[in-house]
């Protein structure tokens, strides 16, 4: 366990100083404290051992203070104890980081407004086999980590492809401990909405020995974690506008009593209820060998095995143009801008879906490092790594179609009212006239072979303190296969149905329509049982158009000079990287064939291979300066260029085109695909940070940043003319990715942390962390039809803050943490947005934990997440067009921790 010491005399000195004088007169206070410390004879005083939260914050502050670049860190309080049990939620406490949640858990993050985040494990690549270039943060068990470092600006010795920053996950090594170490945790968690208990456990064993061939250390760590969730959603989408200048729309407006008035109506509304669970199994084995004082070898195998499963019910009513029929005598109500607010529709189609989804991801990282101090001044490091990752996904959907008598909808309140009525009953199979089944399977496999050689030479005197240079080669491969969605129309309504009780839906706070019917959960969860029940012979086959292979090789060299000329130190360097990219896929065309009776059928599908090869070289200079204004006050200035390569999903060249039949001639034809010709995004970065460290765990920092991003990748819709073999041509709206924009991101961060040791008695255990981030961004949004407008970057809140109250004294520690972020754009390319982006409303969440050390080796911890049951909501650009409202679980966990 990491330990720090300070003297009682210094504690007494700090106890006599108020918070106000500390914050205003910090320089003088720091000098006095240093003088007192030097004057105190250590032999006459008993040292106070600092552990737990204080040691964690002190270690993180030390990393930030002494780093060559701008970095923020999280350090585990003890083995298996990050401040938050979810990795993404731990990261959200860092200034400049915003988290995205999926089914109640943090799943991904953005750094300073950008989602192009690089993920590393102990300074090396780590990723999930998927369309992204990074690790899914859901996959990592937090118990395996010693800490997390977030690099916010680059230096030449850091690996490129970090447009927003790099997140480096650090694991423990056997030489981190003085000798034998054993630690274990056992956790039981309750998830209140789904009302389930789930266990978690972790174990670490480590030891080191002197042998005839040198010192050897072995560490083995394993973590097993299960969680459950339920998510309830009320949705309204999409919205369509009726234009009185369009004859067809004008006729509908006449029936609504809205003649000559532009009016917007919802064309779909309903509810969804999702049940699921996650299972994380992580293992880490590390072996270190130090044959001499100048040579050290480290071998490590890290494995993450993640399982995700859900099944859900959804029930929707569709108010299409032909079904916009108000109930007689009950006219619709509208907002002042013409947006629908409430009313009753009659005789409208309904859909009742039951679905299941599974994901299994495995990532295994093999690494070997040699560190050799060749001379007192020269250190050489050689590093090799192999990563193997796989992901398998399955989606299975059973659907019923029918007709409802009425739909009452009121979207004017904070919780929309959805009330669907049927004279035959929504739980009666006779209400439904048809059924269908959809299934899809896809697999991804990725690998990375990396070799790296670094050398650093330190100078004994002069301005130049050291020179560091290195070479790196990486061979990254990614392959995806996909069946596409297979549609199976069912000849009759199956009998394997059950009633779903919705009495406690939305915690009982929703005005709802009662129970529904669904395909049996016990069957839909089992894919083969579902196929057997529905009489489907086998799973769908993988199709050529679902096959995408990509090979990316990078060749890198860098050189960095580190210098020091009091009061300034820093580094200047350049990184040069060549990227060779090979992308392949298939272009699929399916024509329409008309037989002698005039019947239309799909003709034979034609698959045309697509192969694209590209190379480009990037030159990435960087400069980092640190100016020591006083012993405790420093100013950092940084400038750098960086790149972010397109993701594998964005580069996927495969495209599927189906010729429209006669009934679809006048409809808009659309498809989607990637773009293998995308360029990497390039950024020019300027950073500044003013940092005041007034105690071991006390600091006040302010940082400002500016990024200008060229070749910004966005979703865009373009019109493409497609000619089929019969000579017929059609225009298709193709949704893809383009380098269409120059984006700008600027902002600042404020952060403060302190323990109030000067307070008397038990109050001296109080402490606080607080940070605030402001990010302003602009980029053109050409994703939908209509004029191009400037909107904030997707998933970026302009404001977010964290306030954390801390208490630690004796064996008791506690923490209450509140995280808040302002509204943000979810997407600019949503269904039926009317050229308006989808926004997430402002969102805040309260979490807390309390821990007590029963003995020096045994502790109990109580954690609570989402204590206030916060609702999340989205809307279509303006407040009168709500999209959905979501509730998730509150989680309470009790952990027993033992360490020797």
Annotate each predicted stretch with a short phrase:
Residues 36, 88-125:
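Extracytoplasmic beta-strand/coil segments of soluble accessory domains associated
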Residues 49-80, 107-108, 124, 129:
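N-terminal periplasmic "start-of-domain" segments of outer-membrane beta-barrel proteins
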Residues 94, 140-185, 231, 760, ...:
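A beta-strand signature from Gram-negative outer-membrane beta-barrel systems
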Residues 124-152, 203:
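Short acidic/polar hinge/loop motifs at secondary-structure boundaries
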Residues 194-324, 330-335, 359-369, 374, ...:
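Transmembrane beta-barrel wall of Gram-negative outer-membrane proteins
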Residues 348, 355, 359-363, 546, ...:
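Outer-membrane beta-barrel signature, preferentially recognizing the C-terminal barrel domain
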Residues 705-709, 718, 724-828, 868:
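Gram-negative outer-membrane beta-barrel transporters
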Residues 820-829, 851-900:
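C-terminal beta-signal and adjacent terminal beta-strands/loops
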């Amino acid at each position: 366990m990491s330990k720090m010491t300070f003297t009682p005399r210094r504690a007494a000195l700090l106890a006599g100083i108020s918070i106000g004088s500390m914050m205003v007169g910090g320089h003088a206070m720091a000098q006095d404290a240093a003088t007192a410390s030097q004057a105190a004879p250590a032999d006459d005083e008993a040292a106070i051992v600092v552990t737990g939260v204080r040691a964690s914050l002190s270690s993180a502050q030390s990393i930030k203070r002494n780093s060559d670049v701008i970095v923020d860190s999280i350090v585990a309080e003890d083995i298996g104890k990050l401040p938050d049990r979810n990795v993404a939620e731990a990261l959200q406490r860092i200034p400049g980081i915003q988290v995205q949640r999926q089914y109640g858990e943090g799943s991904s993050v953005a750094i300073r407004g950008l989602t192009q985040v690089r993920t590393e494990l102990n300074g090396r690549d780590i990723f999930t086999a998927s369309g992204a270039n990074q690790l899914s943060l859901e996959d990592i068990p937090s118990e395996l980590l010693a800490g997390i470092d977030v690099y916010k600006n680059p230096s030449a010795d850091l690996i490129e492809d970090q447009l927003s920053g790099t997140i480096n996950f650090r694991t423990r090594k056997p030489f981190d401990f003085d000798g034998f170490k054993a630690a274990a945790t056992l956790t039981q968690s309750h998830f209140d909405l789904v009302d389930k208990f789930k266990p978690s456990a972790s174990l670490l064993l480590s030891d080191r020995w002197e042998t005839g061939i040198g010192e050897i250390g072995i560490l083995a760590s394993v973590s097993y974690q299960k969680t459950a969730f339920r998510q309830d959603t009320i949705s309204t989408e999409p919205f369509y506008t009726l234009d009185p200048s369009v004859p067809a729309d004008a006729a509908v407006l006449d029936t609504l009593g809205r003649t000559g008035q532009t009016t917007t109506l919802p064309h779909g509304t309903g509810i969804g209820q999702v049940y699921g669970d996650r299972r994380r199994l992580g293992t880490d084995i590390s072996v270190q060998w130090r044959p001499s004082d100048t040579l050290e070898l480290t071998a490590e195998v890290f494995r993450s095995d993640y399982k995700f499963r859900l099944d859900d019910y959804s029930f929707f009513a569709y108010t299409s143009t032909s079904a916009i029929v108000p109930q007689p005598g009950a006219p619709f109500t509208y907002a002042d801008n013409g947006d629908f607010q409430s009313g009753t529709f009659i005789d409208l189609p309904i859909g009742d879906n039951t679905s299941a989804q599974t994901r299994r991801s495995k990532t295994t990282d093999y690494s070997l490092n040699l560190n050799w101090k060749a001379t007192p001044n020269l250190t050489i490091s050689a590093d090799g790594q192999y990563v193997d990752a796989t992901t398998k996904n399955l989606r299975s959907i059973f659907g019923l179609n029918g007709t409802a008598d009425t739909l009452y909808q009121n979207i004017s309140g904070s919780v929309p009212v959805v009330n669907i009525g049927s004279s035959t009953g929504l739980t009666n199979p006779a209400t439904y006239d048809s059924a269908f089944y959809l299934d899809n399977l896809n697999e991804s496999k990725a690998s990375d072979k990396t070799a790296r050689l670094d050398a650093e030479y330190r100078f004994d005197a002069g301005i130049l303190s050291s020179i560091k240079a290195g070479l790196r080669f990486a061979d990254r491969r990614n392959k995806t296969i996909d069946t596409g969605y297979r549609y199976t129309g069912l000849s009759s309504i199956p009998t394997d149905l059950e009633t779903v009780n919705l009495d406690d839906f939305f915690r009982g706070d929703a005005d709802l329509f009662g129970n529904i019917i669904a395909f049996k959960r016990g069957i839909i969860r089992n894919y083969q049982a579902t196929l057997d029940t529905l009489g489907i012979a086998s799973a769908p086959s993988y199709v050529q158009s679902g096959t995408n292979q990509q090979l990316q090789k990078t060749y890198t060299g860098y050189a960095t000079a580190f210098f020091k000329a009091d009061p300034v130190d820093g580094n200047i360097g350049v990184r040069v990287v060549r990227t060779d990219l090979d992308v392949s896929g298939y272009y699929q065309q399916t024509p329409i064939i008309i037989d002698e009776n005039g019947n239309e059928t799909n003709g034979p599908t034609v698959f045309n291979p697509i192969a694209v090869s590209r190379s480009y070289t990037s030159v990435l200079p960087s400069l980092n300066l640190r100016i020591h204004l006083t012993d405790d006050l420093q100013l950092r200035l940084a400038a750098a260029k960086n790149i972010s390569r397109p993701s594998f999903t964005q580069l996927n060249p495969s495209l599927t085109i189906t010729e429209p039949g006669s009934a679809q001639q006048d409809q808009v034809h659309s498809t989607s695909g990637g773009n293998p010709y995308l360029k990497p995004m390039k950024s020019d970065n300027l950073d500044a940070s003013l940092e005041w460290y007034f105690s071991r765990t006390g600091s006040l920092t302010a940082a400002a940043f500016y990024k200008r991003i060229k070749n910004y990748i966005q979703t865009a819709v373009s019109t493409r003319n497609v000619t089929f073999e019969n000579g017929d041509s059609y225009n298709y709206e193709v949704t893809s990715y383009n380098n269409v924009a120059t984006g700008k991101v600027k902002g600042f961060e404020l952060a403060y942390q302190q323990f109030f040791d000067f307070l008397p008695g038990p109050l001296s255990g109080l402490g606080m962390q607080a940070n605030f981030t402001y990010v302003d961004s602009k980029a053109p949004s050409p994703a939908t039809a209509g004029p191009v407008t400037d909107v904030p970057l997707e998933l970026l809140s302009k404001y977010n803050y964290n306030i954390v109250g801390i208490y630690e004294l004796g064996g008791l520690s506690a923490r209450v943490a509140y995280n808040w972020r302002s509204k943000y754009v979810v997407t600019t390319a949503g269904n039926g947005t009317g050229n308006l982006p989808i926004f997430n409303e402002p969102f805040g969440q309260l979490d807390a934990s309390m821990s007590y050390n029963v003995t020096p080796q045994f502790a109990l911890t109580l954690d609570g997440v989402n204590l206030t049951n916060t609702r999340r909501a989205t809307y279509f650009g303006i407040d009168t067009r709500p999209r959905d409202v979501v509730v998730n679980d509150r989680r309470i966990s009790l952990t027993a921790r033992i360490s020797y």
